[in-house]
């Protein structure tokens, strides 16, 4: 795999970006009434993160054993895990960016069952321990680009999805891969109450083409910053597809099903004119309500370093993935 030449040490999102006192952060950002002229969805959640009292951090996960392949590393320092994952979209636990960290402790992640089924020769089931022991784990520093036009760079820990799918032996009929989040309304308030959960239909579902799922970049993720994922980041296992918008990164997965037909996806069902199936990061295809040409990068340095920067096609991974979409109209297939 070609080493990612775009990342440098200053690009890594410092963990100090999370759990800062909100008055300090607002002052550092220079947020004012003028900022409210921006498209609502592009700024409202950023503001909502800072309102109310500080929330306690979720318990730290257990340390993981993993390698650091040079193709995914830049000798970047990591900061303590107790300051990570305070700015999340996980509507099952609420709409504010701070809600998942405050509320996701209710999610029971052990025991856990992940089933692989559908168009496969060998259906299989993984339990909680399998997720961290069945495959060698590796740390990968990836960009993460939210459809809301903000971005981070995060050191995820996991294993390539293609290794898991290979064990199940996809049949020649398999064309797509469908994913499903756990449905546990007694643990996830957003699944109980449509107001809390943003009016989405649950359980959350996502999908990829089989060739996208088999790409070496596509990661089944079980950890971050050296330890097991905290609940608000999608414990015990989530998907990371770094060239796509973050909503494709389905969390707390319990089912992977290989299918002949393209599977439904949650945000496409909710607003098909705004959220496509492919969801490839593309500065030339705007969201109907805001531009995707630039993004707010939440980075390292000082109290909080948030800078506007150009959005990269395929989130900077064009050299690796553009060939997947040769001949495909990226405006029509957004």
Swiss-Prot record:
Post-translational modification note: Predicted to be exported by the Tat system. The position of the signal peptide cleavage has not been experimentally proven.
BP terms from Gene Ontology: protein repair
Signal sequence, renumbered to the chain: 1-44
Annotated residues for binding of Mo-molybdopterin: 88, 91-92, 146, 181, 233, 238, 249-251
Annotated localization: Periplasm
SS bond list: none
PROSITE patterns, per the entry: TAT
CDD domains named among the record's database cross-references: YedY_like_Moco (cd02107)
Pfam families the record matches: Oxidored_molyb
GO cellular component: periplasmic space
Gene3D superfamilies attached to this UniProt entry: Oxidoreductase, molybdopterin-binding domain
Known catalytic reactions: L-methionyl-[protein] + a quinone + H2O = L-methionyl-(S)-S-oxide-[protein] + a quinol; L-methionyl-[protein] + a quinone + H2O = L-methionyl-(R)-S-oxide-[protein] + a quinol
SUPFAM superfamilies per record: Oxidoreductase molybdopterin-binding domain (SSF56524)
The protein's Enzyme Commission number: 1.8.5.-
Cofactor: Mo-molybdopterin
Keyword Transmembrane among record annotations: no
Principal location class: periplasm
Family that this chain belongs to: Belongs to the MsrP family.
Subunit record text: Heterodimer of a catalytic subunit (MsrP) and a heme-binding subunit (MsrQ).
Protein's UniProt name: Protein-methionine-sulfoxide reductase catalytic subunit MsrP
The organism of origin for this protein: Shigella sonnei (strain Ss046)
């Amino acid at each position: 795999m070609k080493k990612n030449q775009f990342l440098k040490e200053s690009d890594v999102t410092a963990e100090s970006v999370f759990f800062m006192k909100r008055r300090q952060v607002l002052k550092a950002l220079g947020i004012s009434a003028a900022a409210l002229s921006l498209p609502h969805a592009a700024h409202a959640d950023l503001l909502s993160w800072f309102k109310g009292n500080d929330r306690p951090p979720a318990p730290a996960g257990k340390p993981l054993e993993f390698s650091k392949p040079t193709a995914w590393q830049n000798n970047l320092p990591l900061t303590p895990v107790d300051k990570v994952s305070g700015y999340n979209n996980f509507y099952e636990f609420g709409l504010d960016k701070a809600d998942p960290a405050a509320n996701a402790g209710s999610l029971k992640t052990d025991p856990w069952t992940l089933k692989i089924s559908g168009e496969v020769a060998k259906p299989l089931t993984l339990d909680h321990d399998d997720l961290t022991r069945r495959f060698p784990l590796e740390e990968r520093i990836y960009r993460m680009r939210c459809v809301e036009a903000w971005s981070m760079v995060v050191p995820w820990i996991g294993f390539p999805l293609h290794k898991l799918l290979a064990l199940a032996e996809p049949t020649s009929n398999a064309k797509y891969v469908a994913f499903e989040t756990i449905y546990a309304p007694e643990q996830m308030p957003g699944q109980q109450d449509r107001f809390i959960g943003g009016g989405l239909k649950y359980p959350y579902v996502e999908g990829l083409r089989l060739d996208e799922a088999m790409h070496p970049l596509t990661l089944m993720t079980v950890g971050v910053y050296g330890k097991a994922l905290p609940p608000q980041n999608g414990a015990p296992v989530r998907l990371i597809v770094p060239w796509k918008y973050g909503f494709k990164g389905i969390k707390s997965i319990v089912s992977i099903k290989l299918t002949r037909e393209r599977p439904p996806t949650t945000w496409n069902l909710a607003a098909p004119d705004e959220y496509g199936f492919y969801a490839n990061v593309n500065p030339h295809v705007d969201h109907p309500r805001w531009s995707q040409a630039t993004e707010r990068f939440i980075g390292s340095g000082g109290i909080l370093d948030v800078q506007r920067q150009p959005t990269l096609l395929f989130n900077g991974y064009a050299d690796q993935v553009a060939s997947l979409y040769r001949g495909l109209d990226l405006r029509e297939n957004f």
